[in-house]
Amino acid sequence: MSFPFKPVLLAAIVSQTFPAFAADPVPQAHQDLNEVKVIGGRKAQKLGEEKVRRQALDKQMVSDESDLVRYDPGISVVEGGRSGSNGFTIRGVDKDRVAINVDGLAQAESRSSEAFQELFGAYGNFNANRNTSEPENFSEVTINKGADSLKSGSGALGGAVNYKTKSASDYVSEEKPYHLGIKGGYIGRNSQKFSSITAAGTWLGLDALMVYTRRFGKETKNNSDAADTVITDNKQSWNPNAGSTNYGSRGVARSKPDPQDWVNKSTLFKLGYNFNDKNRIGWIYEDSRTDRTTTELSNMWAANWKGEALGDTRSRQDISYRKRIGFEYKNQLDKGPWDSLNLHYDRQTIDMSTWTWDLPTDYASNGVNSDVYHMFRNIRQKNTQFGADAEKQIDFSKLVWAMQYGLGGSQNDNDNRDHSYWVRLYDPKYQTSNNQELTMLVESSSKNRFAYWNNTFQFGDSSQYRLNAGLRYDNSSSKAKDNPNYTPAIRGQIPYLGSERKHSGFSYGLGLDWKFTPRLNLLAKYSTGFRAPTSDETWLLFPHPDFYLKANPNLKAETAKNFELGLAGSGKAGNFKFSGFQTRYRDFIELTYMGVSSDNPNSPNYAPISDGTALVSSPVWQNQNRSSAWAKGLEFNGTWNLDSIGLPQGTHAGINLSYIKGKAKQTNGQETPINALSPWSAVYNLGYDAPSKRWGINAYLTHTAAKKPSDTVHSSDDLNNPWPFAKHSKAYTLFDLTGYVNLGKYFTLRAGAYNIGNKKYYTWESLRSIREFGTVNRVDNKTHAGIERFTSPGRSYNFTLEAKF
């Protein structure tokens, strides 16, 4: 048997061990089990769903998305360059193909289409990532793996990450009318310091919650020595050991991360009033801003081939801003069409912006007359969403029928603001040129309407069978908007884009939970997902004779079908879940070469330009629905309470592993590798939580296999060669140690040491983020000098101190 399947063999052995343990279904106090809804007297087992509660977020000292999924091998974070992460990777798809929602509110789409990256992304002028969220604002995070648009809507092809914000009821009640929590800490990998305050109270039916968090830090450290790097140009070889002190400090061969300072401020405020036990209104306000200032020393134009300063020094300020205001009304009925009803309305604005300025090398000699060029790029996404969600449970003599149903809609606008100008270096308010406001991105608006009905039936002796069946219908439309600030070439294309474009379709979900013994459950699941084309996939255009990109309003939605089968068990000795899955994707949207242009209006390669004529013999590109794909794999996770074999109470062990493989199928029938598939990984855990709950310690061993070059593809234009940087992917094993101690009644100290062995390694997500063209996120294409800039952090330490009153 080949090595990658050894963890699967281990999983099978462990799964056969659990049924031998005693059948007491009550979990031990130290277990972190999934939250499950109880109907008909027993808990639900769910495939592909994991909940991370506030207690676990605190215990793991989660400060960002990477910490959230650190010990979940089935999900990873997409590298987004200097401005942070760009969503998640689940089951072979990433970015906009994994839905991200906060309280059901969809978060920003990225500008990550292949066309955008070809034209703009490689030069770093846009902050085109998906926005991130403040972990201290959340009471729990639900990670759904596998297609699941029934719950999460558009984008849930590979899965979804759903955040739920804190509420006053998480902390206060009639018996405890107030709560104050204060937390501070240090994150070693990026020299981050943070503080957070959570305050809640209730009085005469009125309750309020406030969470304020501030973080500031520097660039994420790597683990590089770069001592053996030699870079070669066309004429000669330059050896850094032969005498250049500048070597590696600038340009693509730089071995250290670019200097960066960043600050994040986040506020969450909730106010609610209970008229009585049956009626409640609520209001929410969220505000979050992250500013990252980077000196871009690794920019391709920052140095000559020796690493010596070449010209101006480029700096960037990436700004991510999110604001949300929402209202809700909740009602409960003893009899009627619902047991509970939630009406909600939210307005959200997300700004992703980048300031760019170049510090000239001769600024000192020019004195007060030195000028600086400023460039500003802003992508704004405004979203208004409303909905009604209801739940109803009907108890029959031998059957419990629980249903969830509702409807809703949203209005979305994608706007841009781009301008550039010259200012005095020593007086930036003094402009020395006109403000040029021209935008190259087509703005758009869209709307969506949906309705869903989800049912759970539980029947049989001791509620032995549990059957889920759900249906959802979505209808969306999109259209391009005019803007007087479009470049003449762009504005001339607007009449050719046509009228509003529509997408509609159904999403389904079926599930079975059969408790065939007191300790074992057989689980099955079928679900579907879809993703409507993003604004830049549909409307992005670039009428240039060297690269003519046509918009495509006729794109179809991408779709996915997910099949899953699993076995789950629980007892006094612990719990486990073992599952296999297969997902099939269709109509992937890809940038496609259409051939040379034509001046025939009836030709698909018709290439009009602003003066009313058309280009002839220019290369034409367009986003098209082309390939399909499949992914299948195995997942196992389990917890073993070792006091069941005589070890001290509170001792426990765990394992969590994921193995996945898949291929993309091209239009010519050729099957090719999928770069977004992560190599198999396993996490082993051994820990102890004192029965007194005063202290605990956990050790984690994470092993990740190499991504074989043969399992990668160079690009959509070169399907027969591997990704050139895949050869740097090697297997690695990391050892982490975390612990906590409760200092009296009110204080908790937590600490962690990560990568204790100081292992030098590259994650696959980091290697596949390297660009072969453009000016940012580059290494030397020929020698790969600068590759060590992409190593992961070495040994680092975290600690937090929390007080709760």
Residue ranges of model-derived segments:
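C-terminal beta-signal and adjacent terminal beta-strands/loops
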Residues: 110, 223, 530, 581-587, ...
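Acidic, small-polar-rich N-terminal luminal/periplasmic segments of exported/outer-membrane proteins
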Residues: 24-171, 298-299, 565
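Outer-membrane beta-barrel translocator/receptor signature
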Residues: 120-125, 135-145, 149-233, 262-265
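Transmembrane beta-barrel wall of Gram-negative outer-membrane proteins
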Residues: 188-217, 222, 227-295, 321-323, ...
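Short loop/turn motifs that connect adjacent beta-strands in outer-membrane beta-barrel proteins
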Residues: 30, 152-153, 168-178, 205, ...
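Gram-negative outer-membrane beta-barrel transporters
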Residues: 402-404, 459-461, 476, 582-584, ...
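Face-selective signature of the C-terminal outer-membrane beta-barrel domain
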Residues: 274-288, 320-490, 502-505, 509-515, ...
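Outer-membrane beta-barrel signature, preferentially recognizing the C-terminal barrel domain
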Residues: 306-336, 444-446, 496-507, 511, ...
